[in-house]
Regions:
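N-terminal glycine-rich FAD/FM-binding segment characteristic of electron-transfer flavoproteins
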Residues: 1-245
């Protein structure tokens, strides 16, 4: 199992001779990249969403509410890249070579203990084409139970806001947003989600956003392609019941 402490030591040791050291903006990448930048004594750039030149990039600021074009003068660019902001590259015959390297001495500050995989028949949240998500507006576990039934009925992954996670309504690995997972589904359906910028930062690359919330002034409607002013929990239950028939 990869640990950011060990990965950072390995990457820093192999970085000589390279002018770009890039990580995907995943949980592991976000944890390892700053460590590598510190070991190399270089300034870092986080969450790149577009490339303007070898040392000029576009990144989100203010939880993705604004985009900033930044240029670095560092001789080695150390950065994380938001993979959902880029289209996948078609397969090509000349793939980049993969070279094994020797691992440095184990980092005594961190040790891998155990990895417990969450078993689920649903699609992976970060790669799902359809995601249904719930927030505080679903109120309790029964609202999220209806959300799960809806997801299973249409073959979708399940997401949630940080508030819902903090309330104990759903597991942490469902969290979508700046401090959770960045996703780019074809369809994102939000039930009872007001639309804090920390959450909407994680769904900016969704192709179609459908929002259901009883507050007509909820910020989620500003980013939604389709909106319904209604109780998120009741709407979710009604859709789940309709699918069950």
């Amino acid at each position: 199992q990869e640990l950011p402490e060990v990965l950072a030591d390995l990457v820093a040791a192999e970085a000589e001779g390279y002018d770009h050291v890039l990580f995907a903006a995943t949980t592991l990448g976000k944890a390892a990249m700053p460590r590598v930048a510190a070991l190399l004594d270089r300034a870092a750039i986080s969450d790149i969403v577009a490339v303007k030149g070898p040392r000029t990039f576009v990144r989100g600021i203010y939880a993705g509410a604004l985009l900033a074009t930044v240029e670095t003068t560092e001789d080695v660019v150390v950065a994380t890249v938001r993979t959902t902001a880029f289209e996948g590259v078609a397969s090509i015959e000349a793939a980049a070579p993969i070279e094994p390297v020797a691992c440095p001495d184990a980092n005594e500050d961190a040790q891998f203990v155990k990895f417990t995989e969450v078993q689920s028949d649903r699609p992976e949240l970060v790669s799902a084409k359809v995601v249904v998500a719930g927030g505080r507006g679903l109120i309790d576990e029964t609202g999220f139970k209806a959300l799960e039934e809806l997801a299973d009925g249409i073959g979708a992954a399940v997401g949630a806001t940080r508030t819902a996670v903090d309330m104990g309504l759903c597991p942490n690995d469902w969290q979508v947003g700046q401090t959770g997972k960045m996703i780019a589904p074809q369809l994102y359906m939000a039930f009872g989600i007001s639309g804090a910028i920390q959450h909407t930062a994680g769904i900016k690359d969704a192709k179609v956003i459908v929002a259901v919330d009883k507050d007509p002034e909820a910020p989620i409607f500003e980013v939604a392609d389709y909106g319904l002013v209604a109780d998120g929990a009741e709407t979710c239950r009604a859709l789940a019941a309709k699918l069950a028939k």
